[in-house]
């Protein structure tokens, strides 16, 4: 069960493990009718609401808008912030039953993004909090088996975030990295995909656009 239109979890899923997720959150659907500050909410909610249990935020918007372009439109809704902000949400937000909020044809057109979303597990074996500040930005690394995923989000302030890869065990890894594109402040759908080799002794810096993020999948070589 995924309980939508529901208050935050309070132990029901402990007694009934078939209850996989709860709404109880100002989810992405609110962008259809209001201009709440969603990027700021996205870097606040995980520290508060998500502490109570899984959250069905329904991420995955492919129609993305910068701060000064966004408008609440019911017929053709858009998300606040960048495309990579949406991708990173799948790593950051915990929900054993995840959703794709947008039109199926959007995912067919955006194959790289769709493949990344499909690769992110819905449950993990290990969580490692990284550089974060409530209401400002956050980053987290999560492990499933031998694979790691990193998600980072920022509010409307563009910033550079540092990812310390010391959470990785010894060895060499391939990281598939999605970062905000050079034009993401104006065209929020703009992103850059790269593949790099990383080890546990590396520390890398990534620029996040206004309402942006970083998303990566790390596989052992």
Where are these regions (language model features)?
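Conserved, mostly hydrophobic/aromatic
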Residues: 1, 92, 150, 211
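Acidic/polar loop patches that form or flank catalytic/metal-binding clefts of enzymes
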Residues: 1-5, 28-34, 96-107, 124-128, ...
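Aromatic- and carboxylate-enriched substrate-binding clefts and catalytic-loop regions
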Residues: 1-76
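Glycan-recognition and catalytic regions of carbohydrate-active enzymes
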Residues: 102-149, 185-189
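Carbohydrate-binding surface patches
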Residues: 133-170, 214-215
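Solvent-exposed beta-hairpin/edge-strand motifs
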Residues: 167-181
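Solvent-exposed beta-strand/loop surfaces of large extracellular or lumenal domains
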Residues: 177-201
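C-terminal beta-strand-rich structural cap/linker in extracellular carbohydrate-active enzymes
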Residues: 195-221
């Amino acid at each position: 069960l995924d309980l939508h239109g529901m208050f935050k979890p309070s132990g029901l899923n402990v007694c009934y493990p078939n209850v996989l997720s709860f709404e109880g959150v100002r989810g992405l659907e609110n962008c259809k009718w209001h201009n709440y500050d969603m990027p700021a909410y996205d870097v606040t909610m995980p520290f508060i609401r998500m502490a109570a249990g899984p959250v069905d935020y329904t991420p995955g918007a492919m129609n993305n808008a910068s701060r000064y372009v966004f408008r609440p439109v019911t017929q053709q809704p858009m998300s606040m912030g960048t495309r990579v902000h949406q991708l990173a949400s799948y790593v950051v937000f915990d929900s054993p039953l995840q959703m794709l909020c947008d039109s199926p044809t959007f995912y067919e057109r955006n194959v790289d993004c769709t493949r990344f979303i499909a690769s992110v597990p819905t449950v993990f074996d290990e969580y490692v909090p990284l550089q974060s500040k409530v209401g400002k930005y956050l980053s987290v690394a999560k492990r499933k088996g031998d694979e790691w995923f990193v998600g980072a989000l920022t509010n409307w302030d563009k910033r550079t975030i540092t990812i310390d890869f010391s959470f990785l065990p010894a060895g060499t890894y391939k990281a598939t990295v999605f970062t905000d594109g050079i034009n993401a402040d104006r065209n929020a759908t703009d992103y850059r995909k790269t593949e790099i080799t990383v080890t546990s002794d590396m520390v890398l810096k990534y620029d996040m656009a206004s309402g942006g993020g970083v998303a990566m999948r790390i596989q052992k070589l």
